[in-house]
Structure formats: C-alpha cells, structure tokens
C-alpha cells in the first residue's frame, strides 16, 4: 500500500467506537437489530461548522472527510489536530492557519435522512478541480461489487445503513458504514487520507445514489473513479464528465 508523507496530524479520540446497534423488541414479541444514532457538532478553530447525526464510530475520520469533501480545506496538510470529547458530542478540528468563516442560519445539508445541519461555512470555499485519470480494471469493479454483496457487519445485522469502500491497486483497503451515504463516504475519505493514500490511486464504491452532491464530494476528495449500484442524475453525470471523474453506475448487487 503506497503512502505519501504528510505533516503530523494529532488525533485525540476520547469517545472511541460505541455500540453501533441494539436489539429492539417488536409488538409481535420478536426482536430486531436496529442501528444507533449519535449526534455530534464539528467545530473548526472553535467555530461551529456542522451538526451531524451518524453511527457512533470514526468521528475524527468523519470530520476530516467532511471538511475535505465540502470544500473547507484543500488537503489534510492544513489540519493540525482533531479532538473528540469523551461523550462524542463535540469534535474540534484545529487548522494550521486561520480560516475566515461566516455563521450561517442553520440549514440542512445532504445526509440521507440523518438530520445533518450546516452551522457555518468558509468565506472562500475550495473550488472544484479536475481529477487525474486512472486505468480502471474490470476485476476491481467486480471485487467491489462482491464485497458490497457480502455486506459489512452493521448492514448484515440491521439492513439499515449505507456503506462505502476504498480500493487502491485492486485491493479494498477501507470499508465504512453509516446511517447516511454522505457520512459513509466522508468516513471512507477520512480513513484514506489519514493513512496517507494518494487520492489519485483510489476508487470509491458507494451503496447510495449518485446525485450532484455525491459527485462533488468525490471530485473534492481527488479520487478518479466513483462506483455505485445506483444510476446518476443527468446533472451529476455532466459534472463528472466536466471534471474527469469516471462514474461506474448501475452495478447491481446480485439477488440470492
């Protein structure tokens, strides 16, 4: 796994990973496994940025991925420290430089029914830039599709979450789950960046739809390929073509 060197980024996660699901007794007396919701506020240089509702795991990765894919920062090199409190209610991200922000009236941001809210925005959002090309191998897509078909632990238990895989050099290196497809992608991007993986060598596979906001996230992450079992919209396909992002959509999971 090739990595690139990055300035030291300190992570203090006092919350860690909590139980991702629990058993719920249904009216008929049977039990079902249901996912847990966790609410957290993300701050940048002690200024409010986002409120997220997510699964209670990988909060530093979620915060880093969200800032990258929403255009707050251009790279992880800008981040000096990420700190999560013991309750997991607050995620503090400290940058190596001041970042002028403006307080926004609370507004919903895409989160796949997770009540995600933007609390602020950078004065100058990072622009979209063309992504590099990558020679995608058919067997890579088949490997990702098979992994999605097999399912990750939380999905197998609840059938109620989204997944996002990171593939590099034909191998799946990260697999993340969350209540929403946007959160799952942000966690996957955060994992890859913290591991020092070059974005230009990575492929993302999302279990969710691929509208404009998901394509923007992939472009800002710098990945050259986004795979999904769902089809894109006209607008997202046009944006992907404009910036060189390869979309491989309609990769249906086989029924059993």
Language-model segments: what does each one mean?
Residues 2-168, 174-175:
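Intrinsically disordered, low-complexity regions enriched in acidic/Ser/Thr/Pro/Gln residues
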Residues 160-195:
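Protease-associated
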Residues 181-256:
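Feature captures the catalytic cores and cofactor-binding loops of soluble hydro-lyases/lyases
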């Amino acid at each position: 796994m090739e990595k690139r060197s990055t300035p030291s980024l300190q992570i203090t996660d006092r919350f860690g990973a909590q139980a991702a699901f629990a058993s719920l007794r249904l009216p008929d007396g049977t039990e079902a496994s249901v996912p847990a919701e966790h609410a957290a506020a993300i701050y940048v240089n002690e200024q409010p940025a986002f409120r997220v509702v997510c699964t209670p795991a990988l909060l530093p990765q979620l915060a880093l991925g969200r800032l990258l894919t929403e255009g707050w920062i251009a790279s992880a090199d800008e981040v000096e420290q990420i700190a999560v409190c013991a309750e997991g209610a607050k995620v503090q991200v400290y940058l190596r430089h001041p970042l002028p922000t403006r307080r926004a009236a609370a507004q919903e941001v895409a989160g796949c029914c997770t009540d995600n809210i933007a609390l602020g925005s950078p004065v100058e959002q990072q622009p979209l830039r063309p992504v590099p090309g990558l020679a995608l191998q058919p067997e890579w897509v088949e490997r990702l599709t098979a992994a999605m078909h097999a399912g990750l632990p939380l999905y197998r238990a609840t059938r109620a979450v989204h997944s996002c895989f990171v593939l590099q050099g034909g191998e799946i290196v990260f697999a993340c789950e969350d209540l929403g497809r946007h959160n799952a992608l942000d966690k996957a991007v955060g994992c890859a960046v913290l591991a020092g993986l070059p974005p230009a060598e990575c492929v993302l596979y999302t279990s969710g739809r691929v509208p404009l906001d998901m394509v923007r996230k992939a472009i800002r992450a710098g990945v050259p390929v986004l795979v999904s079992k769902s089809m894109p919209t006209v607008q997202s396909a046009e944006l992907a073509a404009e910036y060189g992002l390869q979309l491989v959509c309609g990769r249906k999971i086989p029924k059993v």
